[in-house]
Amino acid sequence: MPKRQDIETILVIGSGPIIIGQAAEFDYAGTQACLALKEEGYRVILVNSNPATIMTDNEIADKVYIEPLTHDFIARIIRKEQPDALLPTLGGQTGLNMAIQLHDSGELEANNVKLLGTELESIQQAEDRELFRTLMNDLGVPVPESDIVNTVEQAFAFKEEVGYPLIVRPAFTMGGTGGGICHNDAEFKEIVTNGLHYSPATQCLIEKSIAGFKEIEYEVMRDKNDNAIVVCNMENIDPVGIHTGDSIVVAPSQTLSDVEYQMLRDVSLKVIRALGIEGGCNVQLALDPHSLDYYIIEVNPRVSRSSALASKATGYPIAKLAAKIAIGLTLDEMLNPITETSYAAFEPTLDYVISKIPRFPFDKFEKGERVLGTQMKATGEVMAIGRTYEESLLKAIRSLEYGVHHLGLPNGETFDLGYIKERIQDQDDERLFFIGEAIRRGTTLEEIHEMTKIDYFFLNKFQHIIDIEHDLKSNKGDIDYLKFAKNYGFSDRVIAHRFDMTEEEVYDLRQQNGIIPVYKMVDTCAAEFESATPYYYGTYEYENESVVTEKEKILVLGSGPIRIGQGVEFDYATVHAVWAIQQAGYEAIIVNNNPETVSTDFSISDKLYFEPLTEEDVMNIIDLEQPKGVVVQFGGQTAINLADKLAKHDVKILGTSLEDLNRAEDRKEFEALLHTIDVPQPNGKTATSPQEALENARSIGYPVVVRPSYVLGGRAMEIVNSDAELEDYMNQAVKASPDHPVLVDRYLTGKEIEVDAISDGETVIIPGIMEHIERAGVHSGDSIAVYPPQTLKQEEMTTLEDFTIRLAKGLNIVGLINIQFVIAHDGVYVLEVNPRSSRTVPFLSKITNIQMAQLAMRAIIGDKLVDLGYQPGIQPYTEGVFVKAPVFSFNKLKNVDITLGPEMKSTGEVMGKDATMEKALFKGLTASGMEVKDHGTVLMTVSDKDKDEIVSIAQRLNEVGYRILATQGTARKLAENNIPSEVVGKIGGEDDLLTRIQNGEVQIVVNTMTKGKEFERDGFQIRRASVENGVPCLTSLDTVVALTRVIESMTFTMKNM
C-alpha cells in the first residue's frame, strides 16, 4: 500500500520531561519517528516541553515548539499551524492522554485534524480497564478476577468477595502511578484513594493478585493490512507483582517451552488484531509456572520502555517503522534498515542473550522506601549482551555504576544470614545481590525459590556464577580456568580478587596468553542474511566480526544509565559530539550501555559498542580499534572518572588534559590556581577526619557546606549549622568516598549564577549566563534558571565574563567548562568548576542557536573559534526570556524528603519561553506539572528565620485574592502585620493541616520547617502529604516569590482605598 497522499503536515506530541516511568526511551522513539516521517516527505511539527533532548533540536522536525504539554497550549499550536494529522503514540502516556483530551474537547474535529496510527477507539479499549476486560472476555482470553471501581466504597465491596492480596491499577497512568499491592484494609484504602486521584478518568481496576506467576512480554507490530509480527519476547526474572520497569529482564525468554512460547505468541497477536493496533504495541502476560494457565495483564497501545529495549536488543527499529505504518506503509513493503535486504515483515531472531537491569535512585535517597511493587521506582536502566546468560548478567551488573561489580555487595560478608534472608523476602532493589550472598553461604535454591518465586533456571545460573567464583580460588593463576571464567562474563577485577593479584596483573596475563574478547554483530537475523550494521558486543569466542578500518578514529564515552544528577542532557552532548567528529572526517565510535537513548541507536555513530563503561571493557575496545584518542568530557562523571584509568594505559585523552581535569577537582591545586589568577572563592578547608572537620568548621564559622570531592549531582552534600549536625554528617557520609577527603566551605547566601563556556585554548566564548531563582544552597540542577539574567548589574556581568575567561585559560580548557558563581553582598565568588559538558548545555544550545557540544568537539579536534566566526566573551543575547524549571518524581518515591538543598533530587527539566519573565515562568511552572491558578488557598508554615520574609509574600497573595491558612506561629506573625489568615491545627489534632491537604482544600503549600533529621518531624509529613495529594509544595521562598509574580501577572490586585 502506498503512503497516504491526503496529508502533508503531521503534528507529533513528545513525552515531556524525564520522570520515573517515562524516561529517555521516548526521546529515542520520537527522534526516530520524526526523522522517518521527514524521510517520507511529510512536514513535521513537534511539540515537547523538554529542552534536554535530541528530539527538540531544529534538525529533527520542520518546526519545533518547546511549550507546555497541556491541552490549551497544544490547541494553540494546532490553530496556528493547521496540521492535517496528529501522531499520538510516540510520546508515551503523556502523548496519548493529550490526544484523547484534544479529541474529547472537539479541538481536533474543529481544525480537521486526523489521528494517525492506532484508532482512538482502540487506544481507549486498551487503556480503559472496563472496555479492555470486556473485549478479553469476548475473545475468550483470561484476565485476572477483577472489578472496575470509581469510589473507595466500590473497592471494598469487591474485596469482600475475593479477599487479599489485591492489586490496584489506575487507568490511563504511566509507570503504575498510584497503584500497588494491598494485603490489608489500611493499605487498600490508601492505595485506592491515591489511585483514583492519579487516574485522569478517576477509575481503578482492582484485581486478585497473581503475584508469583512468570511475567512475559511480547513486543509486537501490526499494519493496516493485518500483517502482524513478534519483534521480541522478553521474560521478567522477577515474577508478576514487580513493575516490569523495575524488573530484571532477559531476552529472548529463557524458561518457556515451545508450547508455552507459541501459545503466548498466538494470544498476543490475536489481541492486537482484535484491538486493531497499527504500529508498535507491548503485551504483558502472566504464566502459571506449574500449568499452561495464563492471564493477560495489560496492553500498551503505543511505543514504550519495553519497545526501546526490544529495539536495542534486536536491532529492529520499532519506532521508525511504527511511524511509517501510521502513514499507511505495510511491513511487507518496508526494508529492515539493519540488513537492507530483508523486509520488515521478517521476525528478528537472536543468537545471544540480553539482560536489562533497572538503575534505582536509592544511592541518592537512602531513606526512600526500597520495596518494589506495581509502581515503578527506577530512573533508568542498563542493557548488556552476551553469549551466555551468566555473561550478559555480569556485564549488566558492572554497567550499573553502584560500585558493585559482581553478584554480591561490597560489604556482603559482614551481614548475618538472617538479615540476608530478610532482605531477599523484602523484594527490594538489592535483592539480586542478596541472593548471590545467600548462595555463597550455602542457602538452598529451594529455599530461595520459596521466598522469591524466581524460576530455578535463573537460580541455577546464579549458583553457577558462585561456583566459578569458588573454583577460581582453588585454580589460582590457571590460564584455562581464567579463560573459562571470562566465557561466563567475569571481570578482571573479580578474577584478580580470587587469584590474589591486581587487576593490572590479570589484564597482562590475558594479553600474554591471547585471552581477549572478540566483537560480534547485532544483526536481527542470527546471521541468516547479510547485514550492514555497525552494532557490536564483546564476548570471549573465536571469530571477530568488527572489522577495523584504515580511517582515523575518535572514541566517545557515553554516560551510562539515567540517574538523578546524570540525565539525558549528557546523551544529548554525546550525540552532538559524534556528529561533529563525523563532519570533521573521522570515524566516530561510541561506547555506551543505556538502551533508552539516542546515542545507542546504531544509525548515529560509525560504530557502536554496547558494552559496560569500565576500565577493562573500554580498554579491550581501544586495544582493537587503536583510536587517535578518547573523548571523556561529554559523558558526565561516568566518563570523566575513567580518564585517569585509561591514561595509565597511555591512551590519549582528547580536549582538556588529564592534569587540568584533576586540577579542577583537587582542592589544593584548585586553590593555588585561583590565587594565581586572582578569582575569589568562599573560605574553605579540607578534612580527612571527623575531628579535623570540626576544627575547620569552627574556624570558618557556621553555616558551612560539607561534601566529598569528586561527586556529581551534589551526592552526599549538605549545609550544616552546628557541631552536632556536622558530627552526624561525618559519621554517615565520609564513607561516600574513603580515598577522597571532605571539603568544608563557608556557606554564602546570595544569587547563584551558572555559566557554560567553550574554549579552544586561546579564545573563550560564553554562549550565555543563567541566573538561578533559588539562592545559593539549592543544587543548580534543582533551581529554576533564567536566561538572560534579570537582576544583574552591568559591572557584575563584566566580572562574571572576566572570571570565566580567567578560569578557562588558567585551567587550559579545550572544549567545555561549566562554572557556578555566587554573588554575595561583597562581590562575586566562584563556587565550583566542572571541566566538562553540563546539564545546561542543551538548554543554552537551543536558546542561543550555538551548538555547544558540536563547537566544543571542533575545538577539541583543533579548529579555532575565531576561524569559525566567533568573537571572544559573552555572545549576543537572544530575544525573549527563557526559563529552565526542574521536574521531580517524588510521587513515585515514598519516604523521600522533598526539601531542596545541595543534594540534587530532580529527574528532569522543562523550558518555558516568552516575551516576559512572568509569561516564561508561567509556562515553565505549568510544563513542570504545577497548576498555576489565579485564586485559591495557600497553606503557610515557615521556620522562624523565614517569618520576616513571608510577610510581604503573604501580603501580595492576599491582594490578588488568595486565602491564607497558616500554622500558629506563622499566623501570629501575619496578624502583627494586619494580614488575615486562618489558623490550622497542628498535625494529629482536629481539622489539622494534613486533613485540609488531603481534602483538596489547599492549592499551594509553602513549607520551610527547620530540618529535622528524623521523619517524625511535622514538616516531613506536610511535604509528603502535599506530594501524595498532588499539591505543589515549595520549600524555598525564592520559588514562592517567583510563583507570586506569575499569579500577579495573571490577575488583578484588589486593594482597598
UniProtKB/Swiss-Prot annotation:
The protein's annotated pathway: Amino-acid biosynthesis; L-arginine biosynthesis; carbamoyl phosphate from bicarbonate: step 1/1; Pyrimidine metabolism; UMP biosynthesis via de novo pathway; (S)-dihydroorotate from bicarbonate: step 1/3
Residues annotated as binding Mg(2+) 4: E832, N834
Binding site for Mn(2+) 4: E832, N834
Residues involved in ATP 1 binding: R129, R169, G175, G176, K208, I210, E215, G241, I242, H243, Q284, E298
Residues noted as binding Mg(2+) 1 in the record, renumbered to the chain: Q284, E298
Reported cofactor(s): Mg(2+); Mn(2+)
The ATP-grasp domain, residue ranges: 133-327, 671-861
The keyword Transit peptide is annotated on this UniProt entry: no
EC number, UniProt record: 6.3.4.16, 6.3.5.5
Keywords: Amino-acid biosynthesis, Arginine biosynthesis, ATP-binding, Ligase, Magnesium, Manganese, Metal-binding, Nucleotide-binding, Pyrimidine biosynthesis, Repeat
Annotated segments matching region Carbamoyl phosphate synthetic domain: 547-929
InterPro entries noted in UniProt: ATP-grasp, ATP_grasp_subdomain_1, CarbamoylP_synth_lsu, CarbamoylP_synth_lsu_oligo, CarbamoylP_synth_lsu_oligo_sf, CbamoylP_synth_lsu-like_ATP-bd, CbamoylP_synth_lsu_CPSase_dom, MGS-like_dom
Binding site for Mg(2+) 3: Q820, E832
All copies of domain MGS-like, residue ranges: 930-1057
Cofactor note: Binds 4 Mg(2+) or Mn(2+) ions per subunit.
GO molecular function: ATP binding; carbamoyl-phosphate synthase (ammonia) activity; carbamoyl-phosphate synthase (glutamine-hydrolyzing) activity; metal ion binding
Region spans: Carboxyphosphate synthetic domain: 1-401
Region (Oligomerization domain): 402-546
Start and end residues of each stretch annotated as Allosteric domain: 930-1057
GO CC annotations on file: cytoplasm
Family indicated by similarity: Belongs to the CarB family.
Domains (record comment): The large subunit is composed of 2 ATP-grasp domains that are involved in binding the 2 ATP molecules needed for carbamoyl phosphate synthesis. The N-terminal ATP-grasp domain (referred to as the carboxyphosphate synthetic component) catalyzes the ATP-dependent phosphorylation of hydrogencarbonate to carboxyphosphate and the subsequent nucleophilic attack by ammonia to form a carbamate intermediate.
Subunit composition and interactions: Composed of two chains; the small (or glutamine) chain promotes the hydrolysis of glutamine to ammonia, which is used by the large (or ammonia) chain to synthesize carbamoyl phosphate. Tetramer of heterodimers (alpha,beta)4.
Task performed by this protein: Large subunit of the glutamine-dependent carbamoyl phosphate synthetase (CPSase). CPSase catalyzes the formation of carbamoyl phosphate from the ammonia moiety of glutamine, carbonate, and phosphate donated by ATP, constituting the first step of 2 biosynthetic pathways, one leading to arginine and/or urea and the other to pyrimidine nucleotides.
Name of the protein this chain belongs to: Carbamoyl phosphate synthase large chain
